[in-house]
Amino acid sequence: MQLSMRMMFTPKHQKLVNQCYPTGRTTDKKPKSSETSYLLYYVNSRRSKLEKVSTYLIKRSTSDLNHRRIGNIAVTLDLMNKIVLHCKENLNVFVKDFLYIMNKVLSNNNFNNDVSVVELIELAFSSICQNLDDVLCNGDMEFVQLYQNFVDLFFKIVTERIHNDDMLLKCCIDISNTNSVSSNPQLNHFVSKSVAYTISKFQERNPKFKTLSLEAALESNLGKRLSRTQTRTIGLDKAAEDNHDLSVKALQSYFNTTETDKLNLSIRTLLRCLQSTPNKELLEFVCNGIPVQLRYIVILLLVRQLSDKDKNVNPIVSLKLMSSLLVSDVSIVGLSVLDIMRKLLNFQLKNATNKEVVAQSCITMTDLNHKTYYAEQTSDMLYELLLKLKSDTVKDVEKNAVVEDIDFLVEHITQPSISLELFIDLAHYMKNHIICLFNIVETEVPSSILFSKLYSLLRELDSHGVQKEMMEEIFDKYGKMALLSGLNYFLENVSEPEYTYYSYHLQAANFLKLNDYKSQTEYKMQTRTLFTKEDLLSYYSDTGSNKYSKKGAQILLSRDNQISTSDLLSDSQVRTTPLEYKNVPNAIFSNGKAVYDNNDFAAKQNKFDNSIDDNIEEANDTVISDANAKGSIYRFVAEDARSWKTMRATAPKVSDLKKTMNEKNIPNNMKRDGSFRGSQSVKSRVTNITFLLNELKTFSDDANKIKDPDEENIVGLDKIDVARSNSLRLAPISSLSDRSSIGNRKSFLQKTATGENQNDDFKDANEDLHSLSSRGKIFSST
């Protein structure tokens, strides 16, 4: 009667909870399925009852703990798990009550040694961790304290009382699944603790990852590298797919993540474990499970360990682990090679007196170049080492370490990757390994200045054997460019017999396959004499036996010793020397016949150069070529050093036309229809009207007038052209209105009278012309 009355006044949520418990005192109880389903429906439809249900579960579990009802505690834990899964949207309402219940159960020695009870606790905790939001972890201090107490207690129970490794690994996975636990300073130590437990259990289950394994990572034999690639062990990324080992899954939960806070803590813990048991296979196995875009963090943290003041950190172990990872098959992207190298180099130089650190740092920097992360990587690394060598603050012992770094790095470079300029800079510091350094120089054609520096460097070498081998390598790499640039260099810079001089000519003879050239070089080497230009021209005169004859002769006849690379590469270019002029026509008659007078033309050029200062007032009346103009930039440049665009033929002048006609004895009263006219180059180039009128002034009555071949009368100049020529002769350039003045035109015609008895009036063009200007035209038709 009392029981029925008590049930009558019991709240509904308590009735529903109590109905889920089966009767009896067995330890393997489970909640009734139908009653549990109704309870879940009830709390889902009436969310306000969730807090009342969780509060009642605390009261019910406390009573069961006091009476040691293990079966009822098991039912309570199972109900909690189901409520979490079905009401996860409102987890914040009851999660603290549930954590309180689990803590009470774990702290009771009558229950915490029961594996089934601990498993149910872990299952409920796993559901909670998977559905927690960031607010509880970062803002609710009560929840943080409950969470912290539970994890500490759980780790203690599973490691000290029940000794269940799987339960421990499951809890580690649950912690990994908790949102924002790694960003909370009060909880993130659980990440490191969980990773340490996980790695320890993984090594126990896989003993090969626990042994000491730090042998030399660098292997130069390609066959061994291929063999290692083909027998590559499965990494963490592949092992978890077909492996049910909880230690592997736990490792994957911590390392196969893009949450950088958690990954950072996990990698730090891994590296601390590897300090005690160094094993490069374990490092590679775990790194394969890290997302490829984040694997560079491992290298960064290994470098950071070098500056760690922790006595437990051995820098040699860190360097060897880094080397093993850099040369392994683990793909790494986004690695800042130069930043890593600078830190390694600074660490090496700070410990320059420690030979073991210096040697291992050298190996690690070389391993850093094992994979190419960007195009100019090798060149940049060598340039960084070169800067250290050139630094004034670096001591001698430190410079020796840097030179060893360069030697070891160059020794393991297999592809041409540096410029000739960088080679020349580095060669001064490593003359004992200059051949090995030259082998990695790119075959791109350098400038003539670099070739000069290269041959100068060659002359500075002490060993004749090295000089000979270097000369062979230069010809093998550059061929034609080595031949022609060397011909130019040794012709201009060597005046005394020396071994490099003869070594060049021997290689040139072998390159050209000229036995006579070779025997002559050997003879001159014995007699200690040098080649003359005439001697060398004999080998560069026959294009049949020497296809580089044209270029070689051009160099030998040139005054200037700085022949540009473009000149050496161009086969069609013809260089003009000061003693040779192109055979260009001075004038062309109307019948197409050309008149040549190059000797007189050359003499006139020299005459103009010498007299230009004395005749400055008549500068407007003289046409001077670009090469001889006093204000021209080409006046101070040797003719054989100009580009091919400036070597075009100089246009003939009207004075040359007059001289040609006088030499042909053309009468002054010749018929107008038989008069000559200038070539097309004269029409296009002679635009200065003042010059034209001055030349007409010294000619005879009829022959001195340039006539239109189709007209009987002299064609008058346009008004604007007349005004323009007047302004050019008499005054500075005026405005357009002044130039178009008719008065100026008349005064100009009066001042330019050619003689007392000569009538040389000009007629204006017809006024009905549509164009008001004919500027740039010499001839026009009416």
Curated annotation (Swiss-Prot):
Is Phosphoprotein one of the keywords? yes
Q: Quote any Pfam family the record assigns.
A: EFR3
Q: Does the keyword tRNA-binding apply?
A: no
Q: Which UniProt keywords apply?
A: Phosphoprotein
**Record GO cellular component, one term:** plasma membrane
- In terms of superkingdom, the source organism counts as Eukaryota
Where is the PTM Phosphothreonine found along the chain? 231, 687, 690
Q: Which residues carry this modification: Phosphoserine?
A: 227, 564, 625, 632, 643, 675, 735, 771, 774
Per its UniProt record, what InterPro entries does this chain match?
EFR3 (IPR039786), EFR3_HEAT-like_rpt (IPR049150)
Query: Further notes on this entry?
Result: Present with 1670 molecules/cell in log phase SD medium.
Which family does the UniProt entry place this protein in? Answer: Belongs to the EFR3 family.
**PANTHER family per record:** PROTEIN EFR3
What is the designated name of this protein?
Answer: Protein EFR3
User: Source species, please?
Assistant: Saccharomyces cerevisiae (strain ATCC 204508 / S288c) (Baker's yeast)
